[in-house]
Design a protein with these regions (language model features):
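Active-site helical microenvironments for divalent-metal-assisted chemistry
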Residues: 1-141
């Protein structure tokens, strides 16, 4: 698995002005919170938020979006709360993480209902902050 130093070095290729201390803190938090979790493939879950945040960096997204990519599943999948997220990483990151969580949270009876609601949620997310949708799309790649 990739080390924090390797990850941060790769991010610098995309934007040398990223605050690597903040991104590094998000890396550490995501690693700690997802420790022991596995993907269906059996790989450590933590490789997923790393991949999401790398996609976001390749797209030229800002630092808050990179941090949101690293932390996009922590409130939904761990004991970490939105209040903790705000305290540790600020309101902007919380809004992004909460938006990504809400985009994937409703289940439907039919495929058509699900598709219509997903479109509605995507358009709503775009109207609030397009970065929410970009994180969600990177999450699906």
């Amino acid at each position: 698995m990739e080390t924090k130093a390797q990850f941060l070095e790769e991010l610098k290729k995309y934007n040398e002005n990223y605050d690597l201390e903040v991104i590094g803190a998000a890396f550490d938090m995501a690693y700690k919170l997802h420790e022991g979790q596995l993907r269906k493939s059996g790989e450590p879950y933590f490789i997923h938020p790393i991949a999401v945040s790398k996609i976001l960096a390749q797209l030229g997204m800002d630092e808050a979006t990179i941090v949101g990519g690293l932390l996009h599943d922590v409130v939904e999948d761990t004991e970490y709360t939105r209040e903790m997220l705000v305290k540790d990483f600020g309101e902007e990151v919380d809004v992004l993480v909460d938006g990504v969580t809400k985009l994937g949270s409703i289940k439907f009876d039919t495929k058509e209902e699900a598709q219509a609601e997903n479109l509605r949620k995507m358009f709503f997310a775009m109207s609030k902050d397009i970065r929410v949708l970009i994180i969600k799309l990177a999450d699906r790649l």
